[in-house]
Design a protein with these regions (language model features):
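S-adenosyl-L-methionine-dependent methyltransferase catalytic core, i.e., the SAM/SAH-binding region
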Residues: 1-302
Length: 302
């Protein structure tokens, strides 16, 4: 069973009441959605996912709790559009868990894992055209270097990109992993897995994860009611920087206004940052994937 990271902290900080209207932007295997649903007997839950396998599994799990939910088969970049289509224009709480779910990592045929052999894929939405195979085999060397640096913060981006271009076509995850290993120093291989950052970078490129998240988060802030909260669990610094920047942007008073003796209400920030939470030691001991997790929480105040 997939273990949701920071589950208790996330649910307890949503400030749910019996009749809350809640959006889970990342349904996955319903770890968060199922706990939310238990706490809103008179409310409603909207859960987004573009992975049909996840939707099928989670629908059964949620149906065993109660029926006041709707699963929306869409990327959360369409958050506002899809909710508006259902005549939903404001909600009490919105949550994101940006980690790749354990089943996606563990199911070899999805091509996310550098430990298991599979065709290069990495698509969250299995209906889209762009996949990891196309990135690895069709992108220019310059574009590969760019995404490895920007999305993987990989210091050996140039040598890895050269190795990929010189060994095309590359079909499977383990082929790619071996090429990465061959193009980094031996000492680097003894640290964390040498393919980790490159696989992250390719996955982000395939799914346009950073742009999609930024657009969606602004929509979430527009949708949440006064007193409502938006929560984001991130697993790497790229996502966390975006979240931190946007939360600071909407919660900080403009420098010029700080000089005023009294700041008019309409010029004060609409949000306040509530907390930044990292996993406790016992969760880190139980779930290795929690190591890099961070939960950021913001609340609408006007």
């Amino acid at each position: 069973m997939h273990k949701s990271v920071l589950l208790e902290e996330c649910i307890n900080n949503l400030n749910l009441s019996d009749d809350s209207i809640v959006v889970d932007c990342t349904l996955g295997r319903a770890g968060h959605s199922s706990e939310i649903l238990k706490r809103i007997p008179n409310g409603f839950l909207y859960s987004f996912d573009q992975d049909l396998d996840a939707i099928d599994s989670s629908y059964k799990r949620l149906s065993e709790i109660r029926d006041n939910f709707k699963i929306i088969n869409s990327n959360f970049v369409n958050l506002k559009e899809k909710l508006n289509e259902l005549n939903v224009y404001e909600v009490d709480a919105i949550t994101y868990d940006l980690g790749v779910s354990s089943p996606q990592l563990d199911e070899a045929d999805r091509g996310f894992s550098f430990h298991k052999d599979a065709r290069l894929d990495m698509r969250m939405n299995q209906n889209q055209d762009l996949d990891a195979y196309k990135v690895v085999n069709e992108y220019s060397k310059e574009d590969l270097i760019r995404i490895f640096r920007e999305y993987g913060e990989e210091k050996y981006a140039v040598s890895i990109a050269n190795g990929i271009v010189n060994n095309r076509p590359i079909t499977t995850t383990l082929e790619l992993t071996e090429i990465i290993k061959e193009n980094v120093p031996f000492s680097y291989r003894k640290e964390k897995h040498p393919a980790r950052k490159v696989f992250q970078a390719i996955r982000i490129e395939v799914n346009d994860e950073l742009n999609v998240f930024e657009k969606s988060l602004y929509q979430a802030l527009d949708l949440v009611k006064v007193g409502g909260r938006v929560e984001v669990i991130t697993f790497h610094s790229l996502e966390d920087r975006i979240c931190k920047r946007i939360f600071n942007e909407v919660s900080k008073l403009d420098d010029n206004l700080k000089k005023l003796p009294i700041v008019p209400l309409e010029l004060q920030p609409k949000f306040k940052v509530v907390a930044n939470i990292t996993p406790k030691t016992d969760e880190l001991d139980e779930n290795n994937r929690a190591r890099s997790a961070k939960l950021r929480i913001i609340e609408r105040v006007r």
